[in-house]
């Protein structure tokens, strides 16, 4: 179903609107790197746009903070259907290091439906391009997804015998 959504939404190129919902800007720097001539994302038809009304894709970095929540919902509604959401970076994927703080709601998927996750802190430009290329069907995914669960302290540091 998602592949047909991508084909319908992205017949020729991918118009992306990027927003930061409360991150440290590490992911933003990597997203900007993807657009430089060194990585040349435009060769894949990826173009950054200045308005969500022109976008096919919403690229979100950072954890969702309480202050940004109403604006993020309005932003999501402004993107025309069919819309695709990418969560970029550990904070957008699950809240990151700020997950349990007083002003953070968590990852983007706590608020909006997320179609694709690109983890990393920050994710390298190659990882961002790879994630988008997999989403577009330009390349096949070489790894199988694993169920994510937070490790307990006992799992991270087993007691010595």
Give the location of each predicted region.
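A contiguous binding-surface segment within folded domains or other stable secondary-structure elements
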Residues: 57-58, 66-68
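Short glycine-/acidic-enriched loop or helix-start segments at secondary-structure transitions
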Residues: 69-71, 96-98, 128-129
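Short glycine-rich anion-binding loops that position phosphate/pyrophosphate groups of nucleotides
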Residues: 22, 63-65, 91-93, 123
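Glycine-rich, charge-decorated loop segments at or immediately adjacent to ligand/cofactor-binding or catalytic sites
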Residues: 93-109
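Iron-sulfur (Fe-S) cluster-binding modules
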Residues: 1-53, 77-83, 104-105, 109-118, ...
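Structural beta-sheet core signal
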Residues: 85-87
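Amphipathic helical hotspot of TIR/SEFIR-family domains
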Residues: 67-80
């Amino acid at each position: 179903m998602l592949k047909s959504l991508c084909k319908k939404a992205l017949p020729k190129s991918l118009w992306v609107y990027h927003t930061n919902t409360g991150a440290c800007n590490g992911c933003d720097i990597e997203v900007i790197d993807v657009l430089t001539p060194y990585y040349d994302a435009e060769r894949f038809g990826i173009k950054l746009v200045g308005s969500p009304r022109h976008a096919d894709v919403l690229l979100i970095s950072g954890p969702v903070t309480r202050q940004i929540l109403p604006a993020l919902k309005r932003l999501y509604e402004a993107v025309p259907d069919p819309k695709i959401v990418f969560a970029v970076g550990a904070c957008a994927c699950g809240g990151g290091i700020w997950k349990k703080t007083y002003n953070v709601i968590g990852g983007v998927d706590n608020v909006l439906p997320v179609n694709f996750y690109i983890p990393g802190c920050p994710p390298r430009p190659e990882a961002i391009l790879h994630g988008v290329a997999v989403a577009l069907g330009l390349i096949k995914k070489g790894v199988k997804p694993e169920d994510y669960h937070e490790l307990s302290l006992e799992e991270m540091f087993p007691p010595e015998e």
